[in-house]
Amino acid sequence: MFALVLTALVAPSAEGSGLAGIKAILNGVRGLKDVLSMKTMIVKYLSLPAVLTAGLYIGKMGPSIHIVTCAAKNLLKFRLFESIRKTKTLKQEMIVCGIAVGCAANDGAVVGGVLFGAELVGTYYSLRNYFKSFYAAFIACMTSRLLHSAVNLNIKPFLTWNVKIVPPSFTLPELFFMLFVAIVMSFVGIAVVFVNEQLLVLRDKYGKLHLGPFKFAKYATNKLVILTENRIIFTIIITLVTSFLSFPQMIGKYMSIGGVPIFEELLMAKPLTTVNGAKGEWIQGNISEVFITISIFITVRYILAILTTVLPVSGGSYLQLLIIGASFGRLVGEGLAFILPDGFSPNHPIVPASYGLVAAAALTSSQTQAFSSVFILLELTGHGVHLPALGASYIGVVISRWLSYSAYDFVIKFRKWPAVLESTTDSDDIRVKYVMQYVDSLPILEEKASLRKIGEFLEKPDLAKTIPIVNNKSDLLLVGCVNTKKLQDYYNTMKPTLEGNPDYDTEIEIEKNTCPITISEDTPLVLAHLLFSKLNLDDVFVVWRGRLIGQVQKSSIIAELTDRNAGFGDA
């Protein structure tokens, strides 16, 4: 309840994992100041432990990354980092380093964290940031592990999850079954994204209504009235249902086990019995009971995890997807081991845990569309390389990108943040000439103009931030550009001269800047996307042999791509 009230009243942007907002910012969206604000960081830092201790089926990797990224962004306010704050590219690199640090500090995954940060950026990543990210992630990982060792009074500086799958954990015939598991989990990941999207639509439509038929309009000015909204009541109900299902005398015998321990248990190399060290009562008598218990576990966990993901509290989904994937893979592995007790070849029995690892990799990769998620998983479990898991992750990403979009992209689309995502610019068939504004409708200035003409020009409504300067309106040779605000300031300075002498009509040469970036009308939109993403531009002039023929704006690209995607979806 503490986390719910704190998030709802103080920082609503602290809900969820926060990774979608980070991706939107890294893809050029402006105006999302609350996503990486100090207020959001503090609220998330205080509410995340409360949500985790409440027993809700959520993870902490995404929120941890969000907290560290907020810290990295707010560090730029100090004078020490002033040079970084003034450079757009370095500011972006600082945020990407924050992603790597958050992942490394939370999971001890240095390589996976850096790669995840690179994938979260979008299509284009500055390779010069690799060393910085690896260095920051290594320091974060070492510090986190050493502090963990100090708290637990042990001498092990590195902590990985207790997963022991002794190689070789599979034979060649088993690769076909692992392929089947990967394909199934890929579609499950797509289903997770789709269901989450529909639940968010419902929450947005009905979540802010108040307790059914009761009217609270007269209390609308009171902030506390937000606690009577349906989304708040729904959160309390989900918490109570989760607590009820975790009761030890019912299915809580295996549902109540924490996130990491249950994942370790599902990847046990031995059968899931208490004799072998299992904490959950998966098997009480006959070995075949494991099929019933795991089936119940998957069903309940899947439903509650999806419902919990859309609650207005801090929390991620990565750990829960690992658990759901591992449980399905374990179920398939146990089935094969039951049918083929000796395996496909002598002295090579089937290891159900290996199927769990493959399924977990496929499900997380399908939901995030990030191949780096498998490296995070392998670092967590202490496995440097597991070929079936790598293959499963690749299958998950390919199928998901073919049929759907990632969990982060759907939030960006749902919130209608103006981000140009890489999934919408894969085709070279879309050219700049289809989305640009032609010169006939552009406000332009000649390089030599009178104050009176400049004043009349500035009276035009909806002027762009940058005005093109041409040699004359017949040749339209682009000679530079001028900032609208600077032009307005210059005119205001010279305006008294014009008012004191109405006949003053001397032409002056406008102080202009060069246009370092221009493109042609046949430039593919994917290349224009590169310019807007990496250089953080709002608009670019389109020229042909030095002649101004138009201007393309970031908003026009977003509108065109949105319309094309909508048309494709309707078809």
Regions found by a protein language model. Give the residues of each.
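Short, glycine/charged-rich "phosphate-handling" switch motifs in NTP-dependent
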Residues: 551
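C-terminal accessory/binding modules appended to enzymatic or scaffolding proteins
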Residues: 512-513, 517-522, 527-531
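Short alpha-helical Gxxx[C/S/T] motif in the catalytic ATP-binding
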Residues: 554
